[in-house]
Amino acid sequence: QSEYYGSAPAAGLVDVRIGTDVGAGPFENYLLEQEFYESAMNGLQWIIDHKDDAWPGVDEEWFGIDIISLSWGITSHEDGGSDGSDMHSRILDEAMQAGVVVSNAAGNSGEDNDGLSGMSASSLSITVASTDDQNTVNRTDDTIAGYSSRGPRKDNGDGNPVNELIPEISAPGSNIVQAEGCVSSGGCNNFLGGDASQNSYTGRGSGTSYATPAVSGVVALVIEANSNLTPLQIKEVLKHTSELRGEPSAPDVDPYWNREFGYGMVDALKAVELAIFLRESGQTESIDHTLQSHGLNFSQSEIINITGHAWGQAGPVERVEFRIDGGEWKDATYSDTPSEIGALTPFLW
């Protein structure tokens, strides 16, 4: 116990080794090809294989593995970085499809990076950028951290530009108080034997590796609020409830994504509130990550006016419906006929 709490203090942890046989030493990433990291693949595959395990000695509510929090990157050794087809990206995609939410670090190569690594280029996982809170509690002055890797991801040529819009979410990752193991300092030495009784929270660190577990904790809260959400639906919940920052970097593809902040700064309260609403209203199954609809304006006098825009990421949208205070679902009116509008083309409703 300590005075410091993360975003999901009651979550359970399952430690899984993904380092190489000799650990993960300094500059190792720059010398070794991604294919060398078979142990990382083995660790991730182990999680997928054991995601439903009944762990001994714990209650049923603690069974299985729900989230992968991955604060590790590997130099891609490819011009322009990974396009998401490397082995690490593919296994993270596999984990998402298997029902395990993946939150992974975007990397710390800054604005002029040479692309994203295999641990940051997955098409399906939640890739996290890092913000700098300027040492204040006011979110209005938060900026993207200078070291945080920018997107987009290298084009994989599949004709769908949406999956290049990485990172997706940003979270605090600068000057973060961290757990620090007592190894050898002053009278404290537990390098060989001993226990963790003298470990502390005396260190501070910065990086997307710190932003990632913050988002992982928010994911845990969302799962607790609505356990019926799939990993891709959870990703949509985070995207739709995040606080937008920056101008759109690819407005022809998505008018909300920014190459620094993704779809915005994570908002735990709004994400949990939306998850609860979807559960209580019975609308969880209605969340489709290929369909986008966003409200633009709301006004109320004698008549309620709601406007927004919508689009499909993979094909046309058939219609947009709305209801007020749980009333009857009604069709919106449109600027154009939705079914005649192709993918990635927003229309007003």
Task: Give the label of every model feature segment.
Residues 3-5, 15, 58, 65-69, ...:
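C-terminal subdomain of the subtilisin-like protease fold in secreted/lumenal serine endopeptidases
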Residues 84-102:
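Catalytic-core regions built around general acid/base machinery
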Residues 120-220, 224, 261, 270:
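Extracellular S/T/G-rich loop segment that most often corresponds to the catalytic His/Ser-adjacent loop
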Residues 1-38, 59-66, 97, 121-125, ...:
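Subtilisin-like serine protease catalytic core
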Residues 108-124:
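Glycine-rich, charge-decorated loop segments at or immediately adjacent to ligand/cofactor-binding or catalytic sites
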